[in-house]
């Protein structure tokens, strides 16, 4: 059980702890593991960088919202979500500005496709304004607390 406080505005069934663990594989190369056992690598070669993962999180989070709502009406012929941003360094430090999420979605002709096209703008807006946890966290902002835990040292400390 986590001691992390839950946001007051969420009922307990809507508040859930999320976590990943990053392990260093080599200088500039890391493996991230989620609680379900999924893994991915990140680093400075062909792997995703942390900034690219943030952008992928924005695209993925909103795309899931949009896909679930529109695919109930028609299976898309094309479904692409692109995210772009400018990385800057200023008096506030390194950060991204001017984030833009663009959806390119095509549906078949016919009643289902027409229905999906009709709800698409509203679903994109709802995802942006309320549903996508990733982009909402960025837009609303939340503190990030960095903690250093003591790690065992010496040759006998590694199992």
Q: Where does each model-flagged region fall?
A:
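Extended beta-strand/beta-hairpin segments
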Residues: 1-56, 64-159
């Amino acid at each position: 059980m986590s001691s992390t406080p839950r946001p007051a505005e969420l009922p307990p069934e809507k508040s859930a702890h999320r976590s990943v663990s990053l392990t260093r594989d080599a200088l500039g190369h890391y493996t991230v593991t989620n609680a379900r056992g999924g893994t991915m690598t990140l680093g400075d070669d062909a792997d995703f960088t942390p900034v690219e993962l943030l952008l992928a999180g924005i695209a993925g989070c909103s795309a899931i919202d949009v896909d679930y709502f529109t695919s109930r009406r028609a299976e898309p012929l094309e479904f692409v979500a692109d995210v772009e941003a400018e990385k800057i360094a200023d008096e506030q430090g390194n950060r991204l500005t001017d984030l833009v999420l663009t959806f390119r979605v095509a549906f078949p002709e016919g009643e289902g496709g027409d229905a999906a096209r009709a709800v698409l703008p509203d679903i994109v807006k709802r995802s942006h304004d309320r549903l996508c946890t990733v982009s909402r966290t960025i837009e609303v902002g939340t503190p990030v607390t960095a903690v250093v835990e003591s790690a065992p040292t010496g040759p006998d400390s590694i199992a």
